[in-house]
């Protein structure tokens, strides 16, 4: 029995020593970490976190690493790709960050965000989209997200109130019913009115049966 225990114990020590040797071998050492898709200021903010991860970059799932850096940099990354190259000189790790593409500013109760085409909020000081959404509640946005995104494709500015929605298109303003009453008919009507009344500045289409025009 002692012989078996001694054999097992000796095997464990041998495996441990081999592991230590391998971990110290240059082939298993991180020689270089290359980062792309970031600005210099961003790299400075997360440099310590990258070094702290160390060999964890070899095994930690990309989704977990993405979550970590999105917490640091306001959810601005859509993805991160991590490639590893092994050589006798050591391991080279390449981290390629993919940024979310902002389609609009979002103002909610005086708080400002950016939004991508999937309706995800984030912040990225390096992006300046030409559209703006004003809305009074995140919950309202989530409930009517697809409808709001469709309205944003039509205009430069969308303002959502409880009793109406205003859409600005190239210097012209459309006043629409509340979000819950808007459907494809209103969107098609906006396109039609732009062609029929090119000189009008304001189109009020909240009321069934008639449309108010302001020629300005």
UniProtKB/Swiss-Prot annotation:
Domain of life the protein comes from: Bacteria
Gene Ontology cellular-component annotations: membrane
Keyword annotations from UniProtKB, A to Z: Membrane, Transmembrane, Transmembrane helix
Transmembrane feature ranges: 5-22
Location of the protein in the cell: Membrane
UniProt membrane topology term: Single-pass membrane protein
The name this protein goes by in its record: Uncharacterized protein aq_522
